[in-house]
Amino acid sequence: MPAFAIGLYDIWDASWRPAYRGAVDKLVTKHGGRYVARTTNPWEVLEGAAPDITNITMIEFPSMEHARAWYNDPEYTPMKRLRQTGSRLDFLLVEGSS
């Protein structure tokens, strides 16, 4: 079953982004993932309060196992640290439907 990694970012210093994106894009592909959404564009809140975020990312993986393997890949660890220098992230992993 597919799985979706959903990132809700609050970015206050984007200087880390060029290095992060280049490396992480390769790791996403390595683990069978693909970006479904990656936006700083406006989004619409249909119900409830708008989260205090500046960016949303959604990555589809073939399975929860693929998504976890990507997130726990040792090559991703330094990228997580880099991202944390200029942002706060709430990251969710959601199993899709077949």
Question: Each predicted region: which residue ranges?
Answer:
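Conserved, structured core segments of small domains
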Residues: 1-98
